[in-house]
């Protein structure tokens, strides 16, 4: 998630992965995985809750973005803090070190040293685990979910590959993306991973 704070896709400091590979990973793998929230909300009669979370988060993000830079920082702090909370589910238990610490270190090291670490984590751990965790909801209505996930992936990929620079370089669009991610995390934490 830390990639969203970076102002331009070409400024992402990596190692092996190039900006174009980042772009394809973000738009084709990472961005669409949250659509399973919609499937879950339909099956579990939580559509109202899902829409409330997304509405409140988007409106709140918009309101925050109207203030000075110190207040705007609240959105980034919320974004990173909730990412740490969310990613803890993927972290190992090693020597009683809290999963939150591993999650924090993942983001910190990715931001400071190389976004390749984060991209590989998302591709090889988080997104596959996300689908695995949500498989019980996906398999209940396979065709609906195949169509939903495929359509979302195609849309994210096409929009992202055509407009990613615009999104990343426009604070309004960037805040919308952050609020969508925050909404996904809140919904997952409250209704799926609780």
Where are each of the predicted segments found?
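N-terminal signal-anchor module of multipass membrane proteins
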Residues: 1-29, 177
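Hydrophobic core segments of alpha-helical transmembrane domains in multi-pass membrane proteins
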Residues: 21-30, 72-85, 116-129, 171-180
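C-terminal ends of transmembrane helices
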Residues: 32-43, 81-94, 128-136, 183-194
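C-terminal transmembrane-bundle signature of multipass membrane proteins
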Residues: 129, 136, 140-194
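Membrane helical hairpin/interfacial module
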Residues: 24-45, 52-61
